[in-house]
Amino acid sequence: MNRYKFNDIENRLGVYFNNPSLIKTALTHSSFGNQFKDAKYNERLEFLGDSVLQLCITEYLFNKFKDKSEGELTKIRSLIVCENSLYEIAKKLSLGEYIRMSKGEELTGGRERMSIQADAVEAVIAAVYLDKGIGFVNDFILLHFEEMINKAINNEIVLDFKTKLQELLQKDGEILIQYELVKYEGPPHRRKFFTNVIINEKVMGIGEGYSKKEAEQNAAKEALKRLEKNYE
């Protein structure tokens, strides 16, 4: 990671590292370590960051919601720390553009892959913890996860838009939902798919993604935005 990129990611995170190698390792995918044998990669940091994130979110929810049961708190926490939520945090911070990975991984769409970006968030959290301590990383997590925490508390995080769309429409009885692949573009190793969701022969949402599944989920998400107003 060159000096410009290092300064840029520090500014994005709002963290200035005493040990720069920590953030460098946090943003190094295992494929890069396989290609360059001396390079450290982020899997161990990811392991630590997962526990740090769980602890900070758990303590926050425990102190904030004294009237909620263990089951309710567990459900809220699971929404905040799930892969989808971590991916949203990664996109907000543009982490994907800073992750070091092998050329092969990048050519197969690794830079946009949800799991790689979500894992990088956990590794970054570990890097901040090791460099700055628990108090600092707790503030860091609450700052960057604030929107996600509020969404989870208000039950606004949806993990499966297709299922939610189907459940919403079941209120009106038998309704036909179809997903139609409209087109795809790009080379085989980085192909983007475009899908319509058709409800009773009417296009209600258009989605795109780097897999057919992702495109269908995004189409369902758009349809939900249009339809939920009718059920409020």
Curated annotation (Swiss-Prot):
Binding site for Mg(2+): E46, D119, E122
Main location per the UniProt record: cytoplasm
Active-site residue list: D50, E122
Cellular component annotations (GO), alphabetically ordered: cytoplasm
Signal sequence residues: none
Domain of life per record: Bacteria
Entry GO MF terms: double-stranded RNA binding; metal ion binding; ribonuclease III activity; rRNA binding
Keywords: Cytoplasm, Endonuclease, Hydrolase, Magnesium, Metal-binding, mRNA processing, Nuclease, RNA-binding, rRNA processing, rRNA-binding, tRNA processing
UniProt catalytic activity: Endonucleolytic cleavage to 5'-phosphomonoester
Stored CDD domains: DSRM_RNAse_III_family (cd10845), RIBOc (cd00593)
SUPFAM superfamilies for the chain: dsRNA-binding domain-like, RNase III domain-like
InterPro entries in the cross-refs: dsRBD_dom (IPR014720), RNase_III (IPR011907), RNase_III_dom (IPR000999), RNase_III_sf (IPR036389)
Keyword Metal-binding found: yes
Span of domain RNase III: 6-133
Subcellular location: Cytoplasm
Function: Digests double-stranded RNA. Involved in the processing of primary rRNA transcript to yield the immediate precursors to the large and small rRNAs (23S and 16S). Processes some mRNAs, and tRNAs when they are encoded in the rRNA operon. Processes pre-crRNA and tracrRNA of type II CRISPR loci if present in the organism.
Record family assignment: Belongs to the ribonuclease III family.
Subunit structure: Homodimer.
Protein name, UniProt field: Ribonuclease 3
